[in-house]
């Protein structure tokens, strides 16, 4: 890998940048309706185990036991997991082609910095063939930390071993981008492929 310009590392988010979110409120609403579950009741039970699941301190089955299978159901956890996976699809004007172009340049270390459970993260990487384009996957399920907490950005910087100002971070959520900026990274808030390409061209990445 030959270094180029002012940056050494390009980090992408996944949900909202390349694919739909793995298990956010929109995806949850679809699956809850499919299984005829009360959304308010689910959401009241969901948040605490969800945080632990994304940090990989509990399994998907532990999460579902806490949020759904605390009483008998007419469907199985595996039925529910299959429906969860079906929600992961590419978004319009996504950044997958940008990821591939940056990786093909062989000038940068290319990776992810995302919040996702191990189950959905690894499914999404395999399903959409993203792994060959990545040098590093800094997912919440591997680091035990979540965006926008400052500690996940600091840990990412330590792992990457380069100054924060030589890292570009791309995320669709302003709060996550702002948190990266606060740790010294160059953050880009993603709104679409054309916008991202234009900004990376200005930075002489593409």
PLM regions and their residue ranges:
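Generic structural signal for small/hydrophobic residues in well-ordered secondary structure
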Residues: 13-16, 56, 102, 112, ...
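Alpha-helical elements of Rossmann-like donor-binding domains used by nucleotide-donor carbohydrate transfer enzymes
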Residues: 26-30, 48, 62, 66, ...
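Asp-based, Mg2+/Mn2+-dependent phosphohydrolase catalytic module
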Residues: 1-7, 117-206
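Short, acidic loop-to-helix structural element flanking the phosphoryl-transfer center
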Residues: 5, 78-110, 122, 150, ...
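Short, surface-exposed acidic
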Residues: 35-46, 72-82, 205-206
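Active-site neighborhood of HAD-like aspartate-dependent phosphohydrolases
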Residues: 2-45
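Metal-dependent phosphoesterase signature
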Residues: 50-96
